[in-house]
């Protein structure tokens, strides 16, 4: 559910937002709302950053190539944050932060997990001219 909210932006920031919105073919309010959402999530969960992917904006463990949902699966599969951190060779603090994010946004993690487990044929349509090994 959304609620209207008025916001004043500096002229330069508004111009950049409008340019980005035109490039993506979305209303500036949609892009702005996404940035506010991601910004508040990042401030509350500093171990997480957002990146653009063919499937849309996705939460990653900061400074790694690991999507948060993958980190959660690794924590489960290795039997805890410390064991997963040793296996993945990343700080346990980052994985613990990703775990906290996943606990706050379980529906998002479930959707990302489902998207990440799509057949390679589906992914090949999203990322044309890319070779996936069988």
Residues of each region from the PLM?
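Short, amphipathic alpha-helical "recognition" segments used to contact nucleic acids or chromatin
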Residues: 64-79
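Short, solvent-exposed alpha-helical "recognition" segments
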Residues: 40-44, 96-112
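Short, basic interhelical loop/turn and adjoining N-cap
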Residues: 26-27, 86-97
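Short, Lys/Arg-enriched anionic-surface-contact patches
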Residues: 1, 42-66
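Short Lys/Arg-enriched helix C-cap and helix-to-coil transition segments
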Residues: 46-50, 107-120
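Short amphipathic alpha-helical segments
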Residues: 7-9, 17, 25-37
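Intrinsically disordered, low-complexity basic tails/linkers immediately adjacent to helix-turn-helix/homeobox/MYB/SANT
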Residues: 54-65, 113-134
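Short alpha-helical "recognition helix" segments of helix-turn-helix
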Residues: 20, 83-86
